[in-house]
């Protein structure tokens, strides 16, 4: 027997199933207040300014919060306090794996303190740095951690700056809290290590100049040579930008200059790994023909063959 004809004005049968609304309304501050026998203002004070509420009252409020499952609106509270609970980590090159390791350490500390972290890419661009600083000034974030090699002159002239901390870099002339390693001493130690292996012709692949961190590592390289009684040769120093391609280009530059070298100290692991790749492409073995030392101790240092000897830089 066929199906009964459907009246012309009736809607087609639905193929979807109606879902029963099983959502439960979130508990409100009023419910907490009722259960605790206090006003909503007292509940708010007990949660945001507990030192201003009597211990017994605070205890009743917390018991009511637990019983109802009430979750305080952190966003609204932060708005009242003009706080975002957000920190920006601004790095010079977001593609460098070293900064991802730093981010992990910063985020771990931030989460423990109730903050979240956003990561920004400066790209050595003054305008981008200014925009990130203005984000903090306009209260889109509570503070800025700077890991860039420059500070725009326009910012340096400002009489008041938002909360800024400089990390692992050095920005001379600025009165800003700074957390950094001793780049000069670390570079000096790297060259001393190579000199003790018997090397006398030690090349240096430097970072971009006049970046303060690059200068520190370059000067540490020169100090290490002096300690070993080695005369510095300007032709053995090549400037790079901390990236892999710069390491490869540095080997091509050194070879084009026709200089002899048996060891290389690179101002970053990425440049060191790039140099190792170019040396292999030119038929030279690492470390039998040329010893290479990097700086940073990124994951890549362990991934290459042979493993890269490098200066460890703490991330946390």
Q: Where are the model-predicted features located?
A:
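Short, solvent-exposed amphipathic alpha-helices that sit
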Residues: 60, 98-112, 186-190, 212-231, ...
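Flexible loop/turn connectors
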Residues: 2, 252-316
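N-terminal helix-turn-helix DNA-binding module of bacterial transcription factors
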Residues: 1-84
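Short acidic capping loops at alpha-helix termini that bridge into adjacent secondary structure
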Residues: 200-201, 232-236, 285-292
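Alpha-helical recognition/docking segments in bacterial nutrient-uptake
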Residues: 1-24, 86-192, 196, 256-260
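Hydrophobic alpha-helical segments within soluble ligand-binding/sensing domains
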Residues: 177-204, 219, 223, 227, ...
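Short beta-strand segments enriched in small/hydrophobic residues
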Residues: 35, 40-45, 79-95, 193, ...
């Amino acid at each position: 027997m066929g199906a009964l004809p459907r009246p012309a004005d009736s809607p087609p049968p639905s193929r979807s199933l109606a879902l029963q609304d099983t959502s439960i309304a979130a508990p409100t501050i009023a419910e907490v207040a009722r259960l605790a026998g206090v006003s909503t203002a007292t509940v708010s004070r007990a949660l945001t300014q507990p030192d201003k509420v009597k211990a017994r009252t605070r205890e009743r409020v917390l018991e009511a919060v637990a019983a109802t499952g009430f979750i305080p609106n952190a966003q609204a509270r932060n708005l009242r306090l003009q706080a975002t609970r957000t920190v920006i980590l601004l790095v010079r090159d977001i593609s460098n794996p070293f900064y991802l390791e730093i981010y992990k350490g910063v985020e771990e500390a931030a989460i423990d303190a109730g903050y979240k972290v956003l990561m920004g890419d400066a790209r050595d661009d003054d305008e981008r740095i200014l925009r990130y600083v203005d984000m903090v000034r306009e209260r889109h974030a509570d503070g800025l951690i700077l890991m860039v090699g420059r500070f725009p002159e326009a910012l340096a002239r400002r009489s008041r700056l938002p909360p800024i901390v400089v990390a692992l870099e050095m920005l001379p002339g600025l009165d800003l809290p700074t957390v950094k390693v001793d780049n000069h001493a670390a570079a000096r130690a790297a060259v001393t290590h190579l000199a003790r292996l018997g090397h006398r012709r030690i090349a240096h692949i430097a970072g971009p100049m006049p970046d303060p961190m690059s200068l520190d590592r370059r000067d540490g390289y020169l100090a290490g040579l002096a300690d070993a009684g080695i005369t510095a040769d300007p032709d053995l120093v090549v400037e790079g930008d901390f990236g892999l391609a710069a390491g490869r280009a540095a080997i091509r530059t050194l070879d084009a200059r026709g200089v002899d070298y048996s060891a290389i100290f690179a101002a970053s692991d990425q440049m060191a790994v790039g140099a190792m790749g170019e040396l292999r492409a030119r038929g030279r073995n690492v470390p039998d023909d040329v010893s290479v030392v990097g700086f940073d101790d990124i994951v890549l240092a362990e991934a290459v063959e042979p493993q890269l000897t490098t200066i460890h830089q703490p991330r946390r």
